[in-house]
Amino acid sequence: GGVETYFFLDGSAAAHDGSATTALYTNWPDNSRISLGTGHDLQFKHTGSLSTILNQVGDLYILNSADNKDILFQCDDGSGGAETYFSLDGSLADGSNNYTKWPDNSIAAFGSAPDLFIYHDGTSSRIRQSTASDLIIENLGDDKDIIFKSDDGSGGVTAYLTLDGTNVRTKIHKSLNLED
């Protein structure tokens, strides 16, 4: 082998705020790999056009242990800026429930086309099937129901329609208005 630069410290790229250094850089040329583990088990790679994190053994954990802080997943917003697409919200977790938050006007899309959308626009929430396929809501629990609930007009919530899996019937709990 010959001599090759694997990485270098670039003092000229350091950032300053006028009185102190705010960022220092270790530079790795394109197509370098940062490899951790005797068998190169965890690798970080940048080719010049894409970046990869590769784990080849065991589970890969991404952990933020700062109290009440989040993990934010951001990407280009379509116009050169960055946007949070979803976050793991540690400030909402209460020990029993964990939260994955999708900001208003986010769309969770499923299928290659995509075909199924779940979204909230800040006011209303929607589940939409966009192709000529069926939308199937299925409960596979033995003797369990599918229950549709909404506001009861007095600040509470009540069931309006139950697909009763125990008694194999449809129950309508409130007045039914059939319109032409």
Located regions from the model:
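Intrinsic low-complexity, repeat-rich intrinsically disordered segments enriched
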Residues: G1-D180
